[in-house]
Amino acid sequence: EYPAVADIDVVNALRESAGALGVTAHTGVVQSKDSFYGQHSPGIMPVGYELMNKWEAWKKMGCKASEMESAALLIVGAFLRVRVGACFLVVANQERAAAGLPNPEVHDTDKAIRVAIEAVKKLIRT
């Protein structure tokens, strides 16, 4: 296993771009997984107990989100010696839903795309 870590310049460009555009953004560790239903329906999986225990551990450690792509991109970027980071759109929050809190689904990618474009512009200039 190899640690999947974003390039700090990419992270900073994304943060600065979000701020400049007035877009709410969070920075931190995310969990990359290879099984969508392993997170959303762990009870149907053969190792459901293990998946649930791991998710609880990630939450306790302050994990911001769970997704399925960034670790591979970050590791390939490290191998190729290119700068890589990630900008996510949170579609829904299963923890809010489980707690009975409002959990609106958001599918509008416009803000995330604008943040990414502005960040790339910053990175090109540096």
Question: In which residue ranges do the predicted regions lie?
Answer:
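Glycine-rich phosphate- or other oxyanion-binding loops that anchor nucleotides, phosphorylated ligands
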Residues: 1-126
